[in-house]
Swiss-Prot record:
It comes from Mus musculus (Mouse). Binds all-trans retinoic acid and may act as a retinoid carrier protein within the epididymis. May play a role in male fertility. CDD domains: lipocalin_12. InterPro entries: Calycin (IPR012674), LCN2/LCN12 (IPR003087), Lipocalin (IPR002345), Lipocln_cytosolic_FA-bd_dom (IPR000566). It holds the Pfam family Lipocalin. The keyword Secreted applies. It is found in: Secreted. This is Epididymal-specific lipocalin-12.
Length: 193
């Protein structure tokens, strides 16, 4: 690959991934503003679906907490904590705001050259109860789509869970792609989707 081709790829890939998020969140209104100061704080990850997950992965992961700390330049330092047996695993990363409200790019500077690019979009939130988050990551071998359902407490309304299911459907995710909660018998309200 010549230098001009590499330059073209570097300059156009962010726009391509950004347009994928817009197209892939169809059926949900585009955010016109995003209040970072209201979004910051502790959230519980109560729903997680991913096109690379399978039913057999459910035993490996469970509900976890995530803390969004607002830093300078409207960046978020994100710290996740999950218990596995008697251990608590934590991992962190930085989200850099993109051009659209509620859209971010995951900072991979410490990951070395050729690190995967990940675009993250808050699709919908009321800031006090729930948030629906869509993540798209391009690796060298596949596109990874992840949908997360965040809650400020451990209980969510049926309508919110229905919205989560509807968003996963727009991403062509099936019930087999759900890590949690187990929604194999859940039938969402057809008026929500």
């Amino acid at each position: 690959m010549g230098p001009w081709w590499a330059l073209w790829l570097i300059l156009t890939l962010p726009q391509i991934l950004e347009s994928q998020i817009s197209a892939m969140s169809q059926g949900f209104p585009q955010m016109t503003s995003f209040q970072s100061d209201q979004f910051q704080g502790e959230w519980f990850v109560l729903g997680l679906a991913d096109n690379t997950f399978r039913r057999e992965h459910r035993a490996l992961l469970n509900f976890f907490t995530t803390l969004f700390e607002l830093k300078e330049k409207s960046q978020f330092q994100v710290t996740n904590s999950m218990t596995r047996g008697k251990h608590c695993n934590t991992w962190s990363y930085t989200l850099i705001p993109a051009t659209k409200p509620g859209q971010f790019t995951r900072d991979n500077r410490g990951s070395g050259p050729g690190a995967d690019r990940e675009n993250i979009q808050v699709i919908e939130t009321d800031y006090i109860t729930f948030a629906l988050v869509l993540s798209l990551r391009q690796t060298s071998s596949q596109n990874i789509t992840r949908v997360s359902l965040l809650g400020r407490n451990w209980r969510l309304s049926h309508k919110t869970i229905d919205k989560f299911i509807c968003l996963t459907r727009t991403q062509n995710l099936t019930k087999d792609n759900f890590l949690f909660p187990d929604l194999s018998d859940w039938l969402p309200d057809p008026q929500v989707c």
